[in-house]
Amino acid sequence: PAFQGVGQRLGTEIESSKDEAATAALKTVELDAVLGGRTPEEETFETRLYQFNGANSNLQERALEVLQYLKVMGDPTVTLETTPGKSAEEFLLDENRPKDVALLDDGRVVEEETMETRLYQFNGANSNLGAERSAEEMLLNENRPK
């Protein structure tokens, strides 16, 4: 089995209650059954996601990550800027970016063959209409940021 022993290791490697360790063991058995006993390496792919709430959290939530955002540099001029590793929360709370338009990736795989994920558009309070339209075109034409 691909995940044999993971549940037992979870109980000793991190601080967790007996209930959490038992739930982890049960879920790994279920995951192993879903994968048909194949090793997880066959199913892995590079991801840009990170998790928050700490290692001991029961609710390891996926956080949105800003892949790229369009920054207004003057009236109609728009430049593309990348921000690898910056969370959506950090981006959205930054008060210096009221004119920005962001494309956010939720990281959940929509189509397994292409490993495509869903993208969402965030428009700043004072964002330029041209930047908003450019981002909409990227989403509609599936010209996803790299």
Curated annotation (Swiss-Prot):
Tissue spec: Expressed in pollen (at protein level).
GO cellular component, one term: cytoplasm
Compartment list: Cytoplasm, Cytoskeleton
UniProt keyword Calcium present: yes
Keyword Cytoplasm: yes
Main location as per UniProt: cytoplasm
GO biological process, one term: actin filament polymerization
Top-level taxonomic group: Eukaryota
Keywords: Actin capping, Actin-binding, Calcium, Cytoplasm, Cytoskeleton
GO molecular function, one term: actin binding
Protein family according to the UniProt entry: Belongs to the villin/gelsolin family.
Subunit architecture: Binds to actin.
Primary role: Ca(2+)-dependent actin filament-severing protein that is required for pollen tube growth. Probably regulates the dynamics of the actin cytoskeleton. It can promote the assembly of monomers into filaments (nucleation) as well as sever filaments already formed.
Identification of the protein by name: Villin-like protein ABP41
Source organism: Lilium davidii (David's lily)
Species lineage: Eukaryota, Viridiplantae, Streptophyta, Embryophyta, Tracheophyta
